[in-house]
Regions:
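Class II aminoacyl-tRNA synthetase-like tRNA-binding/catalytic domains
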Residues: 1-110
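Metal-assisted phosphate- and nucleotidyl-transfer catalytic regions
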Residues: 117-145
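Extended, domain-scale alpha-helical bundle/helix-rich regions
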Residues: 111-115
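Alpha-helical packing segments of well-folded alpha/beta enzyme cores
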Residues: 13-17, 116, 123
């Protein structure tokens, strides 16, 4: 069962992330209401559905595809971000790793992988994360998991 995230901590964190991206001239997009299979671009076996206006739709897992669409249709934007709720139907959720419903803050921007990594480092600095020996841990995704 989900428990409520501390509202003060949630608000503080989300507002700080919003400030970071707004200062970079990113535009916030609302993706939660978009009804499309694009909202379920993670693992198709973990999709939950709902019925709306006589059709079955996937509950959104991510706003990623919509954010990419916003950038493609607005090339003058530096980037875009959204805050949404992700719904997952993990068959074997691992406690502490797989929540079935959770808030998600996502962003998309122009650039390459180095640009993305640099932005993530800037965001971690902005949020006040501590570095170890002057940097953040790095590694191959599969090794870290």
């Amino acid at each position: 069962m989900n428990k409520m995230i501390n509202p003060r901590k949630f608000s503080g964190c989300v507002n700080k992330m919003r400030q970071f991206f707004l200062q970079k001239n990113f535009v916030e997009a609302h993706t939660q209401n978009m009804r499309s299979i694009l909202a379920a671009c993670e693992d198709p076996k973990t999709i939950s559905t709902y019925q709306y206006a006589g059709q079955v739709w996937p509950l959104p897992q991510t706003g990623q595809m919509w954010l990419e669409n916003v950038l493609l249709n607005n090339p003058d934007y530096e980037g875009t971000f959204c805050l949404s709720t992700s719904y997952r139907n993990e068959p074997n959720p691992v406690p502490g790793r797989h929540d079935l419903m959770f808030p998600m803050f996502e962003f998309e921007s122009k650039g390459n992988m180095n640009d993305m990594q640099n932005m993530q480092i800037e965001l971690l600095d902005y949020l006040g994360f501590e570095k170890t020996n002057g940097s953040y841990p790095e590694g191959d995704y599969l090794d870290i998991c």
